[in-house]
């Protein structure tokens, strides 16, 4: 490969348009030498790729052991790694693949899962292989740079421009920072990038050919890994599906192709892109469920049927089936993972100021209630009496003697909901209560087990509602947490209008001094894999929808393209890791996307006026490729406007990756047209852009590598006033650091 080859070989073949009987049509069959033009085949290009990898490795691995303490995000992922090593069950908002990979790496290096990750800044001990885990993440980041280069090549970017774009990506501050730590986002970007590359590579070969199918298979596997790392992988699958439809649209318009082959192509593509990722996703969760077989804190949010399958669980082995007047019972909520009806010796700060009633996910004495007939409170029961549909009861707390109570007060958190009333625990030992303590049992026959459980209350098997006798509202709970004064437990109210499952309850523990001879016992049924799979995903949805959305460094999607603010990952002794993108590349991508959209609108207007557009093969390829990548950008960006969960700037990186691919084609077009007129001037322009990117990277590298820098340099590096990395705690200049060291 000589200089002429590096700069001048054109990977864009001519566009072939033929005349048909009624219309002209585009030939969609790839030319015979397309794959050789757009893949790494020569020894000199392989050498170039090797140099690119070495450069990227230096950038990504430099001082990877620093800081030697926990940074933002590592405390969460590290905790999951420890639980994996000890087989303790947990569930995160993300699928488990990345945590499994980090756990595998840590186990290889002898980690026993005993380190308490605690808070950001906790110093790692010698028995934590944090460098190995960071090295694993960085290695995937290094390969991601190669994958970006290869993706640009298969989509028609010239070797020199693809290499320059890859260098810009290698020194993109946000991707460098993300790949150097034990985080979920780095491996996810790698899997997504691989999926994009192999999917685009399949276009180089004849549809349904062996080589095309191999690339499609690799893309589908990568998609499976991506969606098993973050649900954002679903956006990548959706993008690939849209591109398949885009390709088929052109194929159907190609009169030289039978329509049957186009339909066969579409069916095979969708089968692979959906079935293979789904299989991998289920497989990963199967391993996850089988590996984590020890009861943990997270399992308390799962149904007892689920917890029963875990080692060292505290689920009752069996309980007396028949529930009667005088039974001491615990009531479990059906509709949420909140747990048991609970009351503790703390009052509401407003409203009635009576004792709080909540849902509590752990087994506790404050969960136990005595069932009394409403007309005979405090009665010493001497005979066994079943609880049937319509029975009016009171529930007296076993430990404190107060009764479950509702009245015309606003609930503690849902104060603006007129359809809810406060529920409290009111009274004391010896007090007979009042009519506000009365509740009517309504058995839910549809949800209850067929048979006797539909006729009277049986533990575990009967699902029922409790209707307040005086007001007609139903005992209700929903995924709304009480503030600090309620210990973050789940709110319980009395609701007039609500989903049936949110007003449904069942009895778990059931103790009665007066029981039938040889009382029947019942227990929870064991869950199948599919039932566990569904239960885990219900809880993941719950976490995504109801977890706290506030954070000091959370941000809104509308601010991401402008990068108004970064994220403080770590800060200690005048050194800081601050997540921030390379503003030169970041803002260039944003500007290009806006310019392209405006340009396309102008072109469409010109076309409407009869102007011939898109006649040059380079312009055609530019639009074809950029349109596909900007679809990927949109698919990974706009869904976040409709997501209610806590979001951070790094959630923009998958969309940004697609934006970089599109921008690479803009640089390629610039180099092509300027160089055609002025020799290699276009490449010089692109190289200058790379140098400016490197300047920003170098200037802000202390925020990546946690190295010291002066206050003056730090302040000069704030291109925007909203970038809030710390400068005031630093010494004024390097000379002051030297004097400080000497003293």
Swiss-Prot record:
Subunit structure: PMT3 and PMT5 form a functional heterodimer. Also forms a minor complex with PMT2.
Gene name of the record: PMT5
Pathway: Protein modification; protein glycosylation
Organism: Saccharomyces cerevisiae (strain ATCC 204508 / S288c) (Baker's yeast)
Main function: Protein O-mannosyltransferase involved in O-glycosylation which is essential for cell wall rigidity. Forms a heterodimeric complex with PMT3 and more rarely with PMT2 to transfer mannose from Dol-P-mannose to Ser or Thr residues on proteins.
InterPro entries documented for this protein: GlyclTrfase_39-like, Glyco_trans_39/83, MIR_dom_sf, MIR_motif, PMT_4TMC
Transmembrane segments: 47-67, 130-150, 159-179, 181-201, 232-252, 265-285, 584-604, 624-644, 647-667, 684-704
Gene Ontology process terms (BP): fungal-type cell wall biogenesis; protein O-linked mannosylation; regulation of endoplasmic reticulum unfolded protein response
Gene Ontology CC terms, in alphabetical order: dolichyl-phosphate-mannose-protein mannosyltransferase Pmt5p-Pmt2p dimer complex; dolichyl-phosphate-mannose-protein mannosyltransferase Pmt5p-Pmt3p dimer complex; endoplasmic reticulum; endoplasmic reticulum membrane
Protein name, UniProt field: Dolichyl-phosphate-mannose--protein mannosyltransferase 5
Keywords for this protein: Endoplasmic reticulum, Glycoprotein, Glycosyltransferase, Membrane, Repeat, Transferase, Transmembrane, Transmembrane helix
